[in-house]
Design a protein with these regions (language model features):
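N-terminal amphipathic/basic-hydrophobic helices that include classical n-h-c signal peptides
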Residues: 1-17
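Residue-level preference for long, well-ordered alpha-helices that form the structural scaffold
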Residues: 29, 33, 109-116
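Short, charged/polar micro-motifs that form catalytic or ligand-binding hotspots
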Residues: 41, 106, 110, 141
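Internal, well-ordered alpha/beta segment that forms a basic, Gly-enriched binding/recognition surface
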Residues: 101, 116, 120-159
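Active-site diphosphate/adenylate-binding microenvironment
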Residues: 46-96, 102-109, 116-117, 121-132
Length: 232
C-alpha cells in the first residue's frame, strides 16, 4: 500500500496564527473550517509583515476576502528570503527545507515544538490509529545528513511513540532484515529516490507494510510523474 506523507510544518504556520491554537484540532464541519480559516487569514494579514506586503502588492484587501477559496497563498520563494513568522515570542526552533545543491533553503520558524508534536501526532492517529500498533521505519538519507529537518524531528518522535522501527541511512539490507523479523504492521517512510533504489536493487516483498513517500528525487534521479513512480 502507499500513503501520502504527513506535512505538519505548513499546518503549523496556521496553528501559530490562531488566538487559541487548540481550536483547530476540534473542527467538526465545513462552517467551523471556514470560520477558522478566515480567522487565521485575517490575523496573518495583520501580524505577518511579509504576508501583508505581499497582499498589498497583488492588490488584495483582507476585508474583501470572505471564503477560504479567496485566500491568497504566499509563494514558497518568500520562505527563502523572509522570516514568515507572527509569533509574539521568539521561535523555539527554525526548521529548514532540504534544498537541492546550490539552492537557498526555505526557513520555517516554529513558535512551539509542543504544538508541532501535537499536530503530527493528531494527524497520525487520524490516518493510522494508535502508534503503538505500528512499527515505523525511516529511510531518509539526505535528511539525516543535514540539520534542521522537520521530517526527521517528526519521524524520531513517532518512532518513539511506536516503540519499534528506526532510522536507516543507506543500509538497505539491515532495513529489510529488521522489517522481515518484525511481526507488527509496518510503515516505511522514505524519500522517493531511496525507495526507488530499494525497489530496483532488492525488489522487496513488503507484506503488511504501508509505504509513505516523501521528498522527491533531490537531484539524485530524474523526476518522473507520480503515477509512473508508484508503479515501480
Amino acid at each position: 500500500d502507499s500513503a501520502p506523507v504527513l506535512e505538519p510544518t505548513v499546518f503549523l504556520v496556521t496553528l501559530h496564527s490562531m488566538s487559541s491554537p487548540d481550536e483547530i484540532f476540534h473542527i467538526a464541519d465545513d462552517a467551523a473550517f471556514t470560520r477558522t480559516a478566515l480567522e487565521v487569514f485575517h490575523r496573518q494579514a495583520a501580524a505577518c509583515v511579509p504576508y501583508r506586503e505581499y497582499l498589498t502588492r497583488i492588490g488584495v484587501e483582507p476585508e474583501q476576502v470572505r471564503s477560504p477559496e479567496e485566500i491568497p497563498f504566499l509563494p514558497i520563494e518568500l520562505f527563502k528570503t523572509h522570516d514568515i513568522y507572527c509569533g509574539e515570542t521568539p521561535p523555539e526552533a527554525v526548521f529548514t527545507s532540504s534544498a537541492t545543491t546550490g539552492m537557498t533553503p526555505s526557513r520555517h520558524p516554529m513558535q512551539s515544538l509542543a504544538l508541532y508534536e501535537q499536530a503530527f501526532r493528531a494527524a497520525f492517529r487520524t490516518f493510522y490509529g494508535a502508534p503503538e500498533h505500528w512499527s515505523l521505519y525511516a529511510l531518509l538519507p539526505n535528511y539525516l545528513r543535514r540539520k534542521g529537518s522537520s521530517l526527521v524531528y517528526m519521524a524520531d518522535r513517532l518512532i518513539a511513540d511506536c516503540g519499534s522501527g528506526g532510522f536507516y541511512l543507506d543500509d538497505y539490507e539491515a532495513l529489510l532484515e529488521a522489517m522481515a523479523r518484525d511481526g507488527k504492521p509496518k510503515i516505511l517512510l522514505g524519500v522517493s529516490y531511496a525507495l526507488w533504489d530499494l525497489a530496483e536493487r532488492y525488489a522487496p516483498k513488503l507484506r503488511g507494510t504501508v509505504v509513505m513517500e516523501t521528498g522527491g528525487m533531490k537531484g539524485y534521479r530524474e523526476e518522473i510523474p507520480k503515477e509512473e513512480f508508484h508503479k515501480i
